[in-house]
A protein has these predicted regions:
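Membrane-embedded transmembrane alpha-helical bundles that form the catalytic cores
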Residues: 1-481
């Protein structure tokens, strides 16, 4: 089940909200959230609910030992035990097939590589559990004495399977006591619907454009008369890569919007996960704005404990290399993800050590540099097959013997130019700024317009999104695969 499915929008979520507000008292409401979260998670993968419960129980038990023996060697031993179990399970499910496949390719064994399904959300909830145990060890929060409360934190369907990666210390008090007023409910609904519209009306269409131009297969669907990657014009490939860059931001930020909105509706206040990353003026700035919960996790639980910026430039560079290798691996078990992480390490290291003068560049050129680096980074990220990725990188400049511009490319650009302009605007704060300017104005006409927009936009967004979904096929969020 995904947030943008009809069964979720029309059955699951309304039923959850109804039962939640019929329940009396915080413990009863927490129980409602736990039960619905477990149903949500088990909907597509009933078996892996056992894994989620097991990891949560083990870490709950381990955290009791960490807290009981705080300040002693036993506390660290409990922490190491919990981390080994969590990371061991994550590595088994996420990287075993990759490692065995590479071993088979290089050395001829094993003869058969087993098929191991990746549990949905394991990368996200594992990091949440790790952050909880480390924070207990650091005595930033006490261990949660009640298992069901930790289970609520880990399994809450708003953010369990695709983030944001929520810190226990940020929601520990909200688990015990929450209040929702009319403004919270209104803001939550607006945020949820805006995320839904962003996903269904923008991200999905961008994905459709990308799939028509840079399909992950070696050749496009010939039945649809689409070109092969080798023969596609440079203009067509630029269009497809640009559409994918828009899709991955709109899709992932839409999920975060919906999660934050649903949290507000029941009193949870999750931190923002995106801050208009395509407005960044450096790669360093980009990663302060993109998937902020993941970036801050690696900063606080890997980079700083390794020494951060405190032990000289060679050590800083090594720490940075480790973090970005792990960032690439976190996103997927594939050489392209590792290369993508190392690609960003190179540019971040250049900015940090060799070209700090980048900050003195005129804003336009700094922004252009950032967009170019990010654009080619998404090409590396998209293609799990290096051969296809190289074909596309060459094709972007006509180095495959492909035309730079052809009729098909011009036609596709003309067909999608208006839509892509709207999608680009959605990647900026301009729509939100305009909305707030209108709704906060003291001008009579603006007040009337603001009142209409405040109620009409969410309704219109919901109606158009559901109408689109009625005739659409399954449309999962991109980050569910990580």
């Amino acid at each position: 089940m995904v947030f943008s499915s009809l069964v979720f929008l029309c059955v699951f979520f309304p039923l959850q909200m109804l039962v939640y507000y019929l329940a009396k008292g915080i413990e009863a409401r927490n129980t409602v959230l736990i039960l619905f979260s477990l149903v949500f998670y088990a909907w597509g993968e009933p078996f892996f609910i056992v894994l989620l419960l097991f990891m949560c129980f083990v870490d709950w038990a381990v955290s009791q030992g960490i807290y009981k023996y705080r300040g002693t060697g036993k506390s660290k031993a409990f922490l190491v035990l919990g981390c080994v179990i969590d990371l061991g399970l994550l590595a088994f499910f996420k990287y075993t097939v990759f490692i065995l496949t590479e071993t088979q390719s290089w050395f001829g064994f094993p003869s058969v590589v087993p098929k191991i399904a990746l549990p949905i959300g394991i990368s996200f909830y594992t990091f949440q559990l790790l952050s909880y145990m480390v924070d207990v060890y650091r005595q930033e929060v006490p261990a949660q004495p009640k298992f069901r409360r930790l289970l609520l934190y880990v399994s809450l369907f708003h953010q369990c399977i695709a983030g944001p990666i929520v810190r226990y210390k940020d929601v520990s008090e909200q688990i015990l006591c929450r209040h929702v007023d009319s403004a919270d409910m209104r803001n939550g609904i607006n945020r949820f619907v805006s995320g839904l519209a962003k996903k269904v009306l923008l991200a999905n269409v961008c994905g459709s454009i990308a799939s028509r131009t840079i399909l992950s297969g070696a050749a496009a669907d010939q039945a649809a008369n689409l070109p092969t990657l080798e023969n596609a014009s440079a203009l067509t490939l630029w269009l497809g890569c640009f559409a994918y860059a828009l899709q991955i931001y709109l899709d992932f930020s839409a999920y975060s919007d919906m999660a934050i909105g649903m949290g507000l509706m029941v009193g949870f206040r999750y931190k923002e996960n995106f801050n208009y990353p395509y407005l960044a003026n450096s790669i360093t700035d980009f990663w302060r704005r993109w998937h902020m919960s993941l970036s801050s996790f690696f900063r606080d639980y890997v980079y700083i404990p390794l020494g951060g910026n405190r032990k000289g430039k060679p050590r800083q560079a090594l720490n940075l290399l480790i973090v970005w290798f792990l960032t690439g691996m976190w996103h997927g078990a594939g050489w392209n993800f590792i290369l993508w992480g190392l690609y960003y390490f190179v540019f971040l290291a250049l900015e940090k050590f060799l070209i700090p003068g980048l900050q003195r560049l005129p804003a336009f050129f700094a922004h252009l540099y950032t967009l170019v680096v990010v654009f080619f980074g998404w090409v590396l990220f998209y293609f799990t097959d290096f051969t296809q990725g190289i074909v596309v990188l060459k094709g972007l400049f006509g180095l495959n013997g492909n035309p730079l511009i052809n009729l098909e490319g011009r036609t596709m650009v003309l067909n999608y130019v208006f839509f892509l302009a709207v999608a680009v605007l959605a990647c900026t704060p301009l729509p939100r700024m305009l909305y707030h300017k209108i709704t906060s104005s003291t001008n009579g006409a603006a007040i009337a317009l603001g009142t209409v927009l405040e109620y009409a936009l969410p309704v219109a967004g919901l109606v158009f999104s559901i109408s689109y979904l009625v005739g659409d096929s399954y449309n999962p969020f991109l980050y569910l695969q990580f």
